[in-house]
UniProtKB/Swiss-Prot annotation:
Pfam family name, one: YbeY
Task of the protein: Single strand-specific metallo-endoribonuclease involved in late-stage 70S ribosome quality control and in maturation of the 3' terminus of the 16S rRNA.
Name of the protein: Endoribonuclease YbeY
Cofactor(s), names only, from the UniProt record: Zn(2+)
Main location as per UniProt: cytoplasm
Annotated source species: Vibrio campbellii (strain ATCC BAA-1116)
NCBIfam families tied to this protein: rRNA maturation RNase YbeY
Keywords: Cytoplasm, Endonuclease, Hydrolase, Metal-binding, Nuclease, Ribosome biogenesis, rRNA processing, Zinc
Record: residues binding Zn(2+): 113, 117, 123
GO MF annotation list: metalloendopeptidase activity; RNA endonuclease activity; zinc ion binding
A GO biological-process term: rRNA processing
Gene: ybeY
Known EC number: 3.1.-.-
Record carries keyword Cell inner membrane: no
Co-factor remark: Binds 1 zinc ion.
Length: 154
């Protein structure tokens, strides 16, 4: 099975989005570093859905780039279901321009970042953030992309 992706495109305009193969590649280069098999959903949404979900689940009154919803496996059950990633197209596109990053690289970074959240990583505390950013950089560079945090380090 390896990494099984359910890609949902819930946007008005699908033109210019990464391909399903892109999303699969990014997952295949991330999740097997931590576990051999997984199932997850990536849902690409517009700003309205992102805003509603971010408000409902995080209390933030704005859209966000990526939301992660890890699946909590009931005790005593064996399942490979990791959870869901909700990625907002407009926020990703806007951030790529603001951060002067290639759009495809920023999409890849959002998938890597969200996947690490599903795997239990976080960036609330400084030491956690440092570990997570280091992993993201290593994974992104392993796929041939630049350090996604290079602008912050300069």
């Amino acid at each position: 099975m390896a990494i099984e992706l359910d890609l949902q495109l819930a946007v008005e305009n699908e033109e210019g989005l990464p391909s399903e193969q892109d999303f699969q590649l990014w997952l295949d280069k991330t999740i097997p570093l931590f576990q051999p098999q997984a199932e997850l959903t990536i849902r690409i949404v517009d700003e309205q859905e992102s805003h509603e979900l971010n408000h409902e689940y995080r209390g933030k009154d704005k859209p966000t780039n990526v939301l992660s919803f890890p699946f909590e496996v009931p005790p005593g059950m064996e399942m490979d279901l990791l959870g869901d990633l909700i990625i907002c197209r407009q926020v990703v596109e806007k951030e790529a321009v603001e951060q002067n990053k290639p759009l495809l690289a920023h999409w890849a970074h959002m998938v890597v970042h969200g996947s690490l959240h599903l795997l239990g990583y976080d960036h609330i505390e400084d030491d956690e953030a440092e570990e997570m950013e280091s992993l993201e950089t290593e994974i992104m560079q392993g796929m041939g992309y630049e350090d996604p945090y290079i602008a912050e380090k300069e």
